[in-house]
Amino acid sequence: MAFSLGCSPAFHYLRTQNIGIFTIMINRELIRLKVVQLVYAYYQNEGKTLEVAEKELTFSLQKAYELYEYLLTVLVSLKKHAGRKDAVRVAREKRTGSATRGIAPDKVFADNKFLCQLENNKELIDYSENRKGMWEEENAFIKKLYSRITESDIFQLYIDKEDFSYEADREVVRKLYKTFICDNDEIDAMIEEHSLYWNDDKQVVDSFVLKTIKRFTESSDAEQPLLPMYAVDEDREFANRLFRATIERGPELREIIRAFTKNWEFSRLAFMDVVIMQIALAEILTFDAIPLNVTFNEYLDIAKVYSTPRSSSYINGMLDNIVKKLAKDGRTAKVRVQPSKKDGE
């Protein structure tokens, strides 16, 4: 699932409102994605009650946050592996009386200032204590990943520059994460084995991790907070209200959609398209403070990934016509400011 975080209308709206964009922006996008998945599953499983489905939504969001912590511990595991390798080197040199010429790469990695902060972070330690041995079970993978990282041009350039300032240490970790962990089929496979709830979350959660790396400073100590699961209580409420409004107003919202299907019978529409439009309309009619462009663009992004190739364009046109009619009838005061570039893609 790929979101254009920096260019999304949500980003610009939250920035103008002086809200903590590093948390709210990502959480809202993740919430919308989860609501789409869970609403789709709700209709596929007709025996499921609304209360059970709501609990599943809450659990699914909790699992996404666990994935965030889980991925941060990959970096800590790599650091610990580097420390073990360097300890072997030191013991060997002590035994043989030899000495390493120049810089010892394993020591440099193990002494990385940002990774030291992460290893000592209280929140991450608490998470790891409750899940002992999670990456130790994947020792072969950690070894292979570490080898790829230390043999890479990114790491070699970092070593060659011999700039081991805090900023350089943090930046090399960010680059290495983006290059070797963000796009890693082996990690994706392991994640899927650990939890089916993590299947579609990784690309969004990777952005959480990258933002977290940038939030640390040289003065960050063990109490440095990680990103909270919800930036504000309104985000938690947003998830529950959006899901419930979508289901409870389902018949009404589907009738609205049905009225605007011109050349297609309603029954011939892709089911995912109907679900996405139903949720988008629920958001438009339930949350007055969310700008129309934000709602449009977030669900069009989801449609590009989760539905048919032409769905985004079709949904865009349908929603645009529906909202104009709703505004004309006085059911919403929202007006679309202007079509964004992604609407016409």
Segment roles from a protein language model:
Residues 17-345:
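Class I Rossmann-like S-adenosyl-L-methionine
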Residues 3, 11-13, 22:
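Aromatic (phenylalanine/tyrosine) cluster motif
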